[in-house]
Amino acid sequence: MRKFLSKEYHRTNPLWHVYRLVKFSKVFKNVIIIEFSKFIPSMVLKRHIYKQILNINIGNQSSIAYKVMLDIFYPELITIGSNSVIGYNVTILTHEALVDEFRYGPVTIGSNTLIGANATILPGITIGDNVKVAAGTVVSKDIPDNGFAYGNPMYIKMIRR
């Protein structure tokens, strides 16, 4: 079950009010850092920037590949466990804007987890330990430990250990 907070805007597009929820200066800083960091080849330097400047909780030996797009409004709501791999061009969102509602929530990715290339993780999602997410999957609900998620819409199979 996705866990997120919600702010309703009746008959108004919430993106017109977004800077009432998040300071423009914070978003501007996050955009610069995230866009710059996408192209850093050093995992050590990239992890340091994400942990120290964006306050993302990243476990030991986890790697974030080239061109990964992190949420620009609330990157501090992202947690990645130890020894996990976030593949090429993955998008991790902690917010979503609907026609009349703005939602945001934490994203937690467990340890020893692989997120395949071009996957999208929606806000409020928890992905367990030892999970494999196939390339191109839209993660729209929680995935338990030892799961294998694939497709759009997403299907989950359990991996026997």
UniProtKB/Swiss-Prot annotation:
One of its GO terms (molecular function) is acyltransferase activity. Keywords: Acyltransferase, Repeat, Transferase. Its EC number is 2.3.1.-. Pfam families: Hexapep_2. SUPFAM superfamilies: Trimeric LpxA-like enzymes. The keyword Lyase does not apply. The keyword Transferase applies. Gene3D superfamilies: Hexapeptide repeat proteins. Belongs to the transferase hexapeptide repeat family. PANTHER family: SIALIC ACID SYNTHASE-RELATED. This is Putative acetyltransferase SAR0816. It comes from Staphylococcus aureus (strain MRSA252).
